[in-house]
């Protein structure tokens, strides 16, 4: 069955998506391209970036631009945003910024090292803040920032103290920044639960049979994990100019896992 094309009202807008070469970020890029936006995807792997551009063109007939960027580096974040500005030309406004780059690892507190702490916080917290900071000069009236956190920011998960803390920080950052940038710029946060992505596949491999996708699905009221298109739809809706009265909000896309 052919997927029904949705209209988010983003035609002619410019969007930058970190973590845009795979998973939720890539699907968000696809939907925004399909909607007529100009899309720049950021990621560390040039190979994945090239593959993502090919995939997006194949799916939409439109061209996204890949820019290498490690969001844990202030210099690389600034370079990436300045590259977008140079390509866009005079009077550039960044209409949509999606902070989708993320890092996940399950570890109990007694297992954590300082290096583990630094690695998790560097991507999930510092990376979100650094890229947003680099984008600030180009976030103008009507711009929207969408940060990607997790259901783990809203309720505790076993063996995930550090990950929960890092995503909780993203939620707090979202709410504080929404106050700082109002009324010109909207800042919101989307919190997905387990979604069928390469990151989830790696999580199951790392579990080494300790639990399976079926085990994971059984924990959800909807009896399944999410799909990237379901989360990307919410991200695009939150970023849409049609949601112009929405800021400082935290939206769970979690199959009901945080309801109980």
Where are these regions (language model features)?
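Substrate-binding pocket helix/loop in short-chain dehydrogenase/reductase
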Residues: 108-109, 113-118, 216
């Amino acid at each position: 069955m052919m997927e029904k094309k949705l209209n988010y009202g983003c035609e002619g807008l410019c969007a930058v998506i970190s973590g845009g070469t795979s998973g939720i970020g890539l699907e968000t890029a696809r939907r925004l391209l399909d909607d007529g936006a100009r899309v720049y995807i950021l990621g560390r792997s040039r190979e994945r970036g090239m593959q993502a551009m090919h995939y997006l063109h194949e799916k939409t007939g439109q061209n996204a631009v890949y820019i290498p960027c490690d969001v844990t580096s202030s210099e690389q974040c600034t370079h990436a945003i300045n590259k977008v500005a140079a390509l866009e030309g005079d009077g550039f406004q960044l209409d949509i910024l999606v902070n989708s780059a993320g890092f996940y690892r399950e570890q109990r507190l007694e297992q954590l090292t300082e290096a583990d702490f630094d690695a998790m916080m560097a991507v999930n917290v510092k990376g979100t803040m650094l890229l947003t900071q680099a984008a600030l000069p180009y976030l103008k009236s009507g711009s929207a920032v969408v940060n990607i956190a997790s259901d783990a920011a809203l309720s505790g998960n076993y063996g995930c103290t550090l990950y929960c803390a890092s995503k909780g920080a993203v939620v707090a950052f979202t709410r504080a920044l929404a106050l700082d940038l109002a009324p010109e710029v909207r800042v919101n946060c989307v919190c997905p639960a387990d979604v069928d992505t390469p990151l989830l596949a790696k999580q199951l491999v790392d579990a080494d049979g300790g639990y399976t996708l079926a085990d994971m699905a059984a924990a959800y009221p909807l009896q399944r994990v999410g799909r990237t298109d379901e989360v990307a739809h919410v991200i695009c809706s939150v970023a849409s100019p049609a949601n112009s009265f929405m800021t400082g909000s935290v939206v769970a896309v979690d199959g009901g896992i945080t309801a109980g």
